[in-house]
Amino acid sequence: MIENVRKFSRKNDKVVEQIIDQDVVMINHMILPKGEALPEHKANSNVFMMTVKGKVTLKLNDQNPQVYDSGHILEIPHNTLMNVSNQHDELLELFVVKAPGPKAYGR
């Protein structure tokens, strides 16, 4: 086979998993039930956050929190302070693409 095949979790519990980690790209998959959040952190590359299911509450730097439902791709610049959470009843599922991959950023 020419292609590399990777699987991602299909659960109803909290999941934060790294699917691909290469110099050119990092792809993470996350599932957050209601009330769950990621630790506050700064974007370590250019981030493209894709909401697949549910609604994400996203607070960037000093901005007020914004809510985005499924079907959105959010582009977040490198070094932006991020607060990501699920404050809604529906399970939140997202993919996060970082390009270039953080280990190659700034080389």
PLM feature spans:
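A short, N-terminal "cap"/entry segment at the start of jelly-roll beta-barrel domains
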Residues: M1-V24, G106-R107
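Short coil/loop residues immediately preceding or within conserved phosphate-binding loops
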Residues: K14, I27, N46
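Short histidine-centered beta-strand/loop micro-motifs
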Residues: E17-I19, M30, A37-A43, L60, ...
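Short strand-connecting beta-turns/loops that link adjacent beta-strands
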Residues: V24, Q63, D89-E90
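Short, conserved beta-strand element in jelly-roll/cupin
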Residues: I31-P33, A43-T57, V97
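Short acidic-glycine-tyrosine-enriched beta hairpin
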Residues: Q63-H78
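Ligand-binding loop in jelly-roll beta-barrel domains
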Residues: H78-P102
